[in-house]
């Protein structure tokens, strides 16, 4: 089990600390850094501890920033892997690897060491998160997707981007700009990953791990994804993602149309795309009428222009689910966080991640060829 953070947040050194940290500031940098979360020494804090002023940064969850790689590319990763197999002598070890080299190396080793499901989930959060909020979100995601035996996810790559920590509407537009910058970082990660695959598996002594990678985007995290897709050239896209889950997506309902040239690339990237929507989503209603020039939102109204993608794009209506896990005012009134608040939505997501035929996923009614409703 491993949880990594990919972030284009500013790197700072807090007063009195000896190690670098990601900043809470609403400021993005051109490059991203990789960190690994430390769960070996993690202890669940009491409610009293959570209320303290110093419950911030590493007091929420410890993490270690990977060093930057000395050389670009993944030839050194290949050299280390072949050395560990006794095929090639080398003085290099895993400690010589940095950044995505170290992360891809660790994931490959972990995922290829078991015959059981050991999936990776890339998660992109939405609006209104500072870095401390992101660390708390990581703890929630670990409980839901890694600790839960009903889920095939064993590893998480959390995409951290400097969303606003303010509820002031104007900050929404700052988040749009940040999401565009962060989408560029995500695009670079995708290209690095495809280069890793080419460099490593061009050698016949190394076999693919035959595990799955999923991509999950919530709310305005879909703007980050959209920015990445804008930048991806079709001829460079490899189908390296199994399931894509678009949760309460705060993007235009037209994003799958060819004129948008963004989400219509997802069928080239993934085996299946699932759009989870809630027609009573108050957050997306506010987004539509106050910040997006009355443009209906994908996660509330559903998509247009997906007829040609019906075989692999599904719409899952969560309007009638119960918030039985988290039922305070925020979740019951907002109808925006079903993946956190509803066991029915989580159950549906787990079946999706396992790759169960969409017509065989339980607790759904089939409304159309590719449109389903989760039972209340």
Regions found by a protein language model. Give the residues of each.
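Short, surface-exposed "cap/lid" segments of acyl-processing enzymes
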Residues: 106-162
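Hydrophobic packing residues within well-ordered alpha-helices of enzyme cores
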Residues: 141, 225-228
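Short, mixed-charge, low-aromatic patches
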Residues: 91-99, 137-146, 299-306
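Gly/Ala-rich beta-loop-alpha elbow adjacent to hydrolase catalytic centers
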Residues: 186, 217, 221, 225
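Lipolytic serine-hydrolase domain surface
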Residues: 1-88, 127, 135, 149-211, ...
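Residue in the alpha/beta-hydrolase core beta-strand immediately N-terminal to the catalytic nucleophile
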Residues: 214, 218-219, 245
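Acidic, polar low-complexity linker/tail segments
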Residues: 85-117
């Amino acid at each position: 089990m491993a949880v990594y953070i990919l972030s284009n947040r500013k790197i700072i050194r807090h007063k009195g600390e000896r190690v670098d940290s990601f900043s809470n500031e609403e400021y993005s940098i051109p490059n991203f850094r990789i960190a690994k979360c430390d769960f070996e020494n993690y202890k669940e804090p009491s409610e009293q501890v959570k209320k303290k002023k110093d419950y911030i940064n590493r007091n929420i969850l410890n993490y270690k920033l990977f060093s930057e790689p000395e050389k670009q590319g993944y030839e050194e990763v290949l050299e280390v892997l072949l050395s560990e197999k006794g095929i090639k002598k080398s003085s290099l070890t895993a400690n010589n690897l940095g950044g995505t080299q170290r992360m891809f190396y660790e994931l490959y080793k972990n995922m290829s060491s078991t015959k059981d499901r050991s999936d990776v989930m890339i998660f992109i959060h939405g609006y209104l998160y500072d870095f401390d909020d992101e660390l708390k979100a990581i703890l929630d995601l670990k409980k839901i997707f890694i600790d839960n035996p009903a889920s095939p996810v064993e590893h998480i790559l959390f995409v951290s981007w400097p969303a606003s920590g303010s509820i002031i509407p104007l900050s929404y537009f700052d988040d749009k700009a940040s999401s565009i910058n962060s989408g560029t970082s995500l695009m670079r990660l995708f290209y690095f990953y495809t280069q890793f695959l080419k460099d490593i598996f061009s050698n016949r002594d190394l076999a693919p791990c035959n595990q799955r990678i999923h991509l999950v985007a919530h709310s305005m995290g879909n703007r980050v994804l959209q920015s990445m897709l804008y930048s991806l050239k079709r001829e460079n896209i490899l189908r390296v993602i199994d399931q894509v889950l678009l949760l309460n997506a705060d993007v235009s309902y037209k994003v799958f149309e060819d004129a948008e040239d963004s989400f219509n690339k997802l069928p080239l990237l993934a085996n299946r795309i699932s759009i989870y929507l809630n027609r009573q989503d108050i957050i997306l209603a506010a987004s539509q009428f106050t910040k997006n020039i009355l443009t209906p939102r994908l996660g509330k109204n559903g998509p247009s222009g997906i007829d040609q993608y019906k075989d692999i794009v599904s719409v899952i209506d969560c309007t009638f689910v119960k918030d039985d896990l988290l039922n305070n005012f925020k979740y019951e009134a907002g109808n925006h966080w079903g993946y956190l608040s509803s066991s029915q939505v989580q159950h549906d997501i787990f079946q999706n991640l396992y790759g169960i035929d969409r017509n065989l996923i339980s607790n759904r009614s089939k409304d159309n060829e590719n449109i389903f409703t989760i039972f209340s």
